[in-house]
Amino acid sequence: MERRKATVHVGNLAPSVTESLLYNAFIPFGEIISVALHRKEKAVDRSYAFVEFDEPEDAKEAMENMNYSILCDRCIRVSPANFALSAEETAVPDIAMLHPESADFQTFKSTSTPTS
């Protein structure tokens, strides 16, 4: 099982939210592997968390049921977690993107004219 498919991002968290509170809020949807709460020191309104489930289906159910729900007087956002891709998963860039001066680019213009 891929970790990324079983992990949700929880955003717009209130400053009073704890990992324990998140665990208890999300445990009805399935076995939780981990809860990681992240706080920005200078911006408490930017707190977010990652909740990793054992099964991707549980993460999907949590997103469907918890997105836009109220937690500690805040409307939270629950979405799939977006992790940085590993080197093996990253596509090899086109040489033209790395060295545009060496590529033979063509500019395409629309040849259609407005109809009346």
Curated annotation (Swiss-Prot):
PANTHER family for the chain: ATPASE E1, RRM DOMAIN-CONTAINING PROTEIN
A biological process from GO: mRNA cis splicing, via spliceosome
GO molecular function, one term: RNA binding
Organism: Schizosaccharomyces pombe (strain 972 / ATCC 24843)
One Pfam family here: RRM_1
Alphabetical keyword list: Cytoplasm, Nucleus, RNA-binding
Xref: InterPro entries: Nucleotide-bd_a/b_plait_sf (IPR012677), PPIE_RRM (IPR034168), RBD_domain_sf (IPR035979), RRM_dom (IPR000504)
Gene3D superfamilies: 3.30.70.330
GO cellular component: cytosol; nucleus
Cellular location(s): Cytoplasm; Nucleus
Protein name (database record): Uncharacterized RNA-binding protein C428.12c
Domain RRM residue range list: 6-83
UniProt cross-references to SMART domains, sorted A to Z: RRM
Presence of the UniProt keyword Protein transport in the record: no
Cysteines engaged in disulfide bonds, as pairs: none
Presence of keyword Cell wall biogenesis/degradation: no
PROSITE patterns (alphabetical): RRM (PS50102)
